[in-house]
């Protein structure tokens, strides 16, 4: 490919609103251009990278016998209403009406459609296990699109779906997909951690995220140094090392605590450690009033709590509701005489505490010396706390380390979440009707490309992993009017293009312009044809090298083969 004919509008400086390095470099290098907030055009350089990533996916899916297909972008609302997700998905769904008033949506994912088109046509256990996938543009009405391709309103995604007659088949499919995904990320040069994750609005109970460590990441993962435990912070567990020595129960005492509306203020006012205080927070779970208790030095993990409550909507009570329901403003709510609560759930940290401070359900008042069972009851204990960095992990009891990361993939064991509600049954080997068991598998392809850039930055540009680099070799001719350089450049272009993707910079530009653009192209090998062309010598440089190396033309093939294969 001749660079003089290649549309690659580079920028000297990134726009001021581009925060992520990947966003800055993709704009500066002419990979993408913004059309509107969260929506991008993929220019030739960016599209080459995208297609190479898609080719890797196609090859690895072929290797596990999963065929590709394509579903429509425009979906009827009725399918999502049938599954119950039309309302649950929330404001991020692009909804529209046709001229006849029929409601539709732009697909953010396709579980319902695959259930309707595929699962409902699987009538016998003999047709399973089966898996299919597609690579297509998805739509999500992000409230704050940002970081370029990392959080957009339109993005390219691989989404795959599996169909099984038994749980054992689903487990095998899940493991096959996980293995294939790890190979995809490895070939794309993206370092990932498979971590325990929340299924969110997707349904099902078991899921694994693939998290790519990066400074710009919006997620946090908790891992140990041995790699035997890894979880998204939303789902991370840890061992609580605090132990309170048993005490004789003291008399319950009501005390005034004016203006003490935080744990820190209350602990200082009462001269007690935060571990001797039990926080009480009122949640509204659908139409239930749930009082949640946790030790004062810990924070409630609302994702874990949501799993326990299993409600469509879980939120904290607002200020007016607090007073109306409990009789107290914030800071004074507590579990004693909390007959207004439909349920009381406590974190495990509350189990073995003695003579603690709890709210008195009266503004500016607390009880001291409250004791579980004697003074208040708990309906259910569960792990609903947020893990802290440095706490022991639950597997090897090693300190947890927190890392910011980018979610680039997510796989789910959906089970019968969709097939139950949408009526997709098959006949088992005994002739009995059963719901098809499903799995769902996704890679954010464009997000993966941004993660690759974030993990492969150079001082002035990108060092693309070789399998997704837009070009394997960037051939740069220093003086276009030098016939010796031109002859050698054209000879190398012809020879190398037979085996590799080659970009030949044949522009009549200054060397500084050419080298700056080459840093942004980020080809695994840069071959510069300069003043020593007459001696049969070129300069070879990898993106991470500080200086180029002179190589005789007779040795060039061996050097290239060593680097690129």
UniProtKB/Swiss-Prot annotation:
Q: What is this protein called?
A: Proline--tRNA ligase
UniProt subunit comment: Homodimer.
One GO molecular-function entry: transferase activity
Q: Where in the cell is it found?
A: Cytoplasm
Source species taxonomy: Bacteria, Bacillati, Bacillota, Bacilli, Lactobacillales
NCBIfam families cross-referenced by the UniProt entry: PRK09194.1 (NF006625), proS_fam_II (TIGR00409)
The coiled-coil segments of this chain are none
Question: By its UniProt entry, which Pfam families does this protein fall under?
Answer: HGTP_anticodon, tRNA-synt_2b, tRNA_edit
Question: Could you tell me which PANTHER family the record lists for this protein?
Answer: MITOCHONDRIAL RIBOSOME PROTEIN L39/PROLYL-TRNA LIGASE FAMILY MEMBER, PROLINE--TRNA LIGASE
Entry note about domains: Consists of three domains: the N-terminal catalytic domain, the editing domain and the C-terminal anticodon-binding domain.
User: What reaction gets catalysed by this protein?
Assistant: tRNA(Pro) + L-proline + ATP = L-prolyl-tRNA(Pro) + AMP + diphosphate
Designated gene of the protein? proS
Q: What class of enzyme is it?
A: ligase
Give the UniProt family note. Answer: Belongs to the class-II aminoacyl-tRNA synthetase family. ProS type 1 subfamily.
Q: Which GO terms describe its cellular component?
A: cytosol
The UniProt entry, under InterPro entries, shows:
aa-tRNA-synt_IIb, aa-tRNA-synth_II, aa-tRNA-synth_II/BPL/LPL, Anticodon-bd, Anticodon-bd_dom_sf, Pro-tRNA-ligase_IIa, Pro-tRNA-synth_IIa_bac-type, Pro-tRNA-Synthase_IIa_type1
> By its UniProt entry, which CDD domains does this protein fall under?
ProRS-INS, ProRS_anticodon_short, ProRS_core_prok
Keyword flag Ligase: yes
